[in-house]
Amino acid sequence: MDIKINKKKKALVTGGTGFVAGWIIKQLVEAGVNVHATVRDPSDGAKVGHLLELSQNSPGSVTLFQADLLKAGSFNAAVEGCSFVFHTASPFILKFNDPQRDLIDPALKGTQNILEAVSSSDSVERVVLTSSCVAIYGDADECAFVPNNMLNESIWNTTSSAFHQPYSYSKTVAEKEAWKIAEAQEKWSLVVINPSLVLGPTVSGKSTSASHDICLQMGDGTMKAGAPPFEIGMVDVRDVADAHIRAAYILDASGRHIVSNESCTPMKLSKMLQEQFEQYPLPKKELPKWLVWLVGPIMDKSMTRKVIAKNMGHSWKADNSKSKEKLGIEYRSLNTSIIEMFQQMIDEGSFKKS
């Protein structure tokens, strides 16, 4: 499905140094769009240099703006003159001290602040929000109780909280707030992208996203004794970026969109890597659930026995037909995604050969 991108209309991408944001910006500037990108510190060359390089080597341009998710009004300058806003900025961290402070407040207040700036603008036509599949479900065992045992866009996560799966809770409350704000006005439309676990290389060449942790643990020996038996949806980052852009420029796009290629396990990912990267300590077997239940909380405090019981050994399925039919997404092979991701992490020295 071909889409027409209006090069004369500017676009804003929040969280410009993020994993998904980098690819959205790259695709937009290569199409000739002038992009505003918000970052924490525009003067930090180590973190924003790749964005400036995109601006130099593409028909479009990137202009950086400083913004803080928690600071009201900090997005106003970046929004000015933009027709499309891609709100990707939200904390995705697996280790934190205070879930309310570190995850929930930035996700919720950041969404409120960017949409307040959007509503104050006269130029914005559409907002594309980066939500997540975890705004649809809380734990994998819930798949057994939904129609056809398959997650769909009509389902909402009702089981996560600040104390159980707080990241999932942060994405849920942020998306609900976005819909509440969008439905209370008529100046701009909202389209939501709900990706599963995002894999693939980064635009910056630096593996900084929590999405890279699974790859890191397979390559650094953490999973050498075996991989945990959990299944989750996975998708290439370039497909997620493509979905955002299509959601912006396809006029009749609406609602939520599950963007997930297929369900997979760490062990299946390891098998994809073993032929090409056999010199690394990749897991060769899957651990039994009882063993993960026993030692998991000792190894990782966020891996509670409740999380293990409700997510390990359960089937995970999601219906991605809307993303294919309404957005025209053609998914890349996960084999390509994980190999390119792993190779990039080797190139930057993330782990050593065994």
Residue ranges and their predicted role:
Residues 96, 157-163, 204-235, 239:
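A conserved pocket-lining segment of Rossmann-fold NAD(P)-dependent short-chain dehydrogenase/reductase
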Residues 3-34:
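N-terminal Rossmann NAD(P)H-binding glycine-rich loop of SDR-like oxidoreductase domains
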Residues 160-190:
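Active-site Tyr-X1-5-Lys
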